[in-house]
Curated annotation (Swiss-Prot):
Organism encoding this protein: Escherichia coli O1:K1 / APEC
Catalyses which reaction(s): prephenate + S-adenosyl-L-methionine = carboxy-S-adenosyl-L-methionine + 3-phenylpyruvate + H2O
GO BP annotations, alphabetical order: tRNA wobble uridine modification
Task of the protein: Catalyzes the conversion of S-adenosyl-L-methionine (SAM) to carboxy-S-adenosyl-L-methionine (Cx-SAM).
Keywords: S-adenosyl-L-methionine, Transferase
Assembly and oligomerization: Homodimer.
Keyword S-adenosyl-L-methionine: yes
Coiled coil: none
Protein name: Carboxy-S-adenosyl-L-methionine synthase
Family recorded in the similarity comment: Belongs to the class I-like SAM-binding methyltransferase superfamily. Cx-SAM synthase family.
Amino acid sequence: MSHRDTLFSAPIARLGDWTFDERVAEVFPDMIQRSVPGYSNIISMIGMLAERFVQPGTQVYDLGCSLGAATLSVRRNIHHDNCKIIAIDNSPAMIERCRRHIDAYKAPTPVDVIEGDIRDIAIENASMVVLNFTLQFLEPSERQALLDKIYQGLNPGGALVLSEKFSFEDAKVGELLFNMHHDFKRANGYSELEISQKRSMLENVMLTDSVETHKARLHKAGFEHSELWFQCFNFGSLVALKAEDAA
């Protein structure tokens, strides 16, 4: 059962850096719905993309799976035999709950839920990889290597879904969308104190990039095609495609 997010409703004397600990995991479904505009749409559309891209006898990777929302959406839309989903996250609290969520919904496609570092896992025989609001928590210097590894592990014709919070090269646009996002959180019941305290905890661990930076990295990794397929304010999702004739 998900609880309402009130983690930052009272003043916190010493704000540390953000961690996906037990307290966050307990309220995460409510937190992300009230904080990330378009999150439900992204999750459901990931399932539609899976229906199009997942091939028989291949694997799907959900890197930074949190509670397994994207994994479940993918699994509901796999209609082939001999597929497997590998869901990985480095938060013990998230993984514990993810396993419970996955086990609560029976389906033919098996899911391996792994507590580990996405930088260490091998990507093999993949028809689809999901990075759903995960890359932004890696050090910027480590992001290209992960995308390179994903590209190498994708089969020809495979797809990467990359969802992120964005920064903007146009400062005026960035300011507008930043303020619209805060309006969104206020409309969902967050106070100014809650918004401010959470932002202070996240600012050193969640480092955002522009869409242009993401596309440049994807191109450098080898992806022949990439495009923004969803955006709401400063949140969105790209899809990157490996050519069907890629070596």
